[in-house]
Amino acid sequence: MKRALLLVCLSMCCSLLQADEPAAGTAQSAAASDRYETRRIHDPNGIGKFYMGREIAHVMGFAGAAWLERSTREEEERLTLLIRALRLKPGDVVADIGAGSGVISMLMAEPILPGGRVLAVDVQQEMLDRLKAYCEQLGVENVEPIRGSQKRSGLKPASVDMAIMVDVYHEFEYPYEMLADISKALKPGGRLVFVEYRKEDPAVPIKEVHKMTQAQVRLEAEQPEFGLSWLETVHVLPLQHV
């Protein structure tokens, strides 16, 4: 059974992709050297590094944790609708890639009980420390913080039923390497979910480099070496694709 990728965008867009083993050898190494492009003139909100025609955005640092936890987020993004659309079930092992301070991780923790776990992955230890403190404060025992890197998630191969990235993928400095790694972490039949602000809609009040079109997500995620196959796009959120 193939692994699946679910793309979720606020005004949701869901894509399911199947992950294959990346090709190895000299040809792939040569391609890697040409994978990214640096431009001197670029969007000030981006890092000047481009991948498949898209500029990579600056990462939201620990100083932005309060924005992730803002009281108006449910009203603006309807996170409860997102969680419902994920169709989580008891016993699922779910990876929250770029978990930040754990807002999404905490929302997913209850629907997968009993027996389920959330693997909360982030590159910033300060975010993981904050998440851990929230879990202890609220008595949440099935969320496990994992320190990742710019090129590796820290997840074991074939270990998760679903991996989700909420407003995160567009900030990856090495998106190709991260997708290759995450696709390997999916169990057979597993799902990879992208949630991104809709670049198709100019009315979405987010900086342009922090948006993605559904077409761009599919272009990047459906490369043959990942073995991911698009499943569906779900339109339920006010601002994002799922």
Model feature map: region roles:
Residues 7-15:
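Bacterial N-terminal signal peptides
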Residues 95, 99-152:
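Class I SAM-dependent methyltransferase SAM/SAH-binding core
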Residues 161-176:
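A short SAM/SAH-binding and catalytic strip from SAM-dependent methyltransferases
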Residues 227-239:
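Conserved S-adenosyl-L-methionine
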Residues 109, 176-191:
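A short glycine-rich, Lys/Arg-flanked "PGG" loop and its adjoining helix->strand segment in the class I
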Residues 28-95:
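Class I SAM-dependent transferase core
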Residues 153-162:
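A short acidic, Gly/Pro-enriched loop at the edge of an enzyme's catalytic core
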Residues 191-218:
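Conserved class I S-adenosyl-L-methionine
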